Amino acid sequence: MHVARQDAEALVYVSLAQLMALEFSTRALSFVGRQPRGSLLSGSHASRLRGRGLDFDELRRYQPGDDLRHLDWRASLRTGNPVVRTFTEERDRPVWVVVDQRMSMFFGSTRSFKSALAAELGALAAWMALRAGDRVGAIVFNDQHIDSITPLRSRTRVQALCSRIVHYNHQLDALQPDAEDSGQLDTVLQRCLAVAGHDHLICLISDFAGAGPRTLQLLRQLATHNDVIALQVYDP
């Protein structure tokens, strides 16, 4: 990921224009790996993540290499030729991008502050979800506040999400006192449990400062019925 920066300030804070420009950096990115050769999925958004069903697409004549398990015997007998069922993948699923902007993130010694990198990663995740045809929403939080944006499949929603991230990012200030660990990360995960019932994708971007046994318990609980991607941001 390459983001042009004009001055040292950009290493600390992100701008809305910067996050919106990341839309064009997602074309080669995906939350999942490529499907194996010979995959039966005929949709353009094949996925190994849970929560996506296969929808019947059409009947067509058998072609060499087709999986015999998908032969439709009734249609084959009716037409006198082997016929197979083809499927497209259900594309729509809610994606929650969870971005940490606590004071523990307001530090960096090399490329950028952790808070700025988390903001960029959050925007990338949102653009990836939209490009995949999914609804995208967000939970953005700092030491005192937690904001939620309901998932929606639209570029306007991604812009609103990025704007909220920028708002939280610009509230960070080195003159602020270090916040005592108040269990905010666990509170955020509880919010995730409340909004993501089943078959959602949660992309959590944080330094995981203050994480403990309860945090792991909540993550496991969240992953029981959802896909969870946790990205830990740290300063080397």
Per-segment meaning from a language model:
Residues 1-48, 61-66, 75, 84-120, ...:
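Exposed, interaction-prone extracellular/peripheral surfaces
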Residues 51:
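Catalytic cores of large soluble enzymes that bind and process phosphate-bearing ligands
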Residues 54-55:
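Small-residue-rich anion-binding loops in enzyme active sites
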Residues 58:
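Acidic, metal-associated active-site segment
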Residues 69-79:
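N-terminal low-complexity, intrinsically disordered segments
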